[in-house]
Curated annotation (Swiss-Prot):
GO terms for cellular component: membrane; plasma membrane. Channel that opens in response to stretch forces in the membrane lipid bilayer. May participate in the regulation of osmotic pressure changes within the cell. One of its GO terms (molecular function) is mechanosensitive monoatomic ion channel activity. The lineage of its organism: Bacteria, Bacillati, Chloroflexota, Chloroflexia, Chloroflexales. This is Large-conductance mechanosensitive channel. It is found in: Cell membrane. It is a multi-pass membrane protein. NCBIfam families: mscL, PRK00567.1-4, PRK13952.1.
């Protein structure tokens, strides 16, 4: 059983998947930082304030609170700001993955080989073509 497990783990696909998961986790942290530390402040600059979507919420029980944590402690809350941040993160990750896949596909695709020009006919072939043409004209 240990031997089978070792063979399973040593297959390329499993190792590639593990590397992909680890890189994906690290990439998620980078995207979160990009959204929270760069994109949201730029949006805040454009709309004239701080674009902190994490505190955008609608209390469902009618309570009032200034932060999402306070509102969640007081009762049910629609935290649409957190959802908006997750959507922005997803769109950024999807775009970056699309660009990576697109680049890899372009690198993989080989330009179509141009077929070589047909070789010049040999003197014998030219002579045979002339004989054929003469016979065709005669009837």
């Amino acid at each position: 059983m240990i031997k089978e497990f070792r063979e399973f783990i040593s297959r390329g696909n499993v190792i590639d998947l593990a590397v992909g998961v680890i890189v994906g986790a690290a990439f998620t942290a980078i995207i979160n930082s990009l959204v929270n530390d760069i994109i949201n402040p730029l949006i805040g600059l454009l709309v004239g304030g701080r674009a902190d979507f994490s505190n955008y919420f609608i209390p469902l029980a009618g309570q009032t609170a200034t932060t999402l944590a306070e509102a969640q402690a007081a009762g049910p809350v629609l935290a649409y700001g957190s959802f908006l941040t997750a959507v922005i993160n997803f769109l950024l990750i999807a775009f970056v993955v699309f660009m990576i896949v697109r680049t890899v596909n372009r690198m993989r695709s080989k330009p179509e080989a141009v077929p070589p020009a047909p070789p010049e006919p040999t003197p014998s072939e030219r002579l045979l073509a002339e004989i054929r043409d003469l016979l065709a004209r005669q009837g």
